[in-house]
C-alpha cells in the first residue's frame, strides 16, 4: 500500500511559534526542517529529524489567537527502550522548558514521564520499546 511509505506531518497551531519550535528542537533533539512567513496569512516552522518519516509543523495564523491545548490527553508519545536514552531525554525536556506533569491517563506514568509545553500540549517519553 502506497500510504505505508508516506511521510507523516503532524500540524498544530500555536500563538508562540518561535518559542514552541525552539522548545521542541531542544527537548527532542529535532532540527528546523523548514519554515515560511505570511503564506496567505500563516507563518510556520517544521521540525524533526531529516531522515525520519515524520515531522511536526507548528503554525500561526496572523491575527488569530488559538489559546491552549483543548484537553490534557493530546499527546505525542516517543518510545525509548534504552534507560540511558530515556533519562537523557527527560533531562533535555526539562532543560528546554517543558514542565513535568502527571499524565491524564495514568497508564503513561507506569513506564514514562509526561511533559507539557507552553501551549499545554503534552509529550510522553516512554521507557520501553514499541511492539505492534
Residue ranges: model-predicted function:
Residues 51-56, 119-123:
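Short, charged/polar, Gly/Pro-enriched secondary-structure boundary elements
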Residues 41, 72, 109:
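Exposed loop/turn and edge beta-strand positions of beta-sandwich/beta-sheet ligand-binding modules
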Residues 1-3, 9, 35, 90-132:
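Vicinal oxygen chelate
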Residues 44, 77, 112-114:
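Short hydrophobic/aromatic beta-strand element in the GNAT-like acyltransferase core
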Residues 12-54:
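Core segments of cupin and vicinal oxygen chelate
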Residues 84-89:
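Short, conserved charged micro-motifs
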Residues 59-64, 127-130:
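Acetyl-CoA-dependent GNAT
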Residues 1-21, 73-78, 129-132:
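N-terminal beta-strand motif that seeds the catalytic metal site of vicinal oxygen chelate
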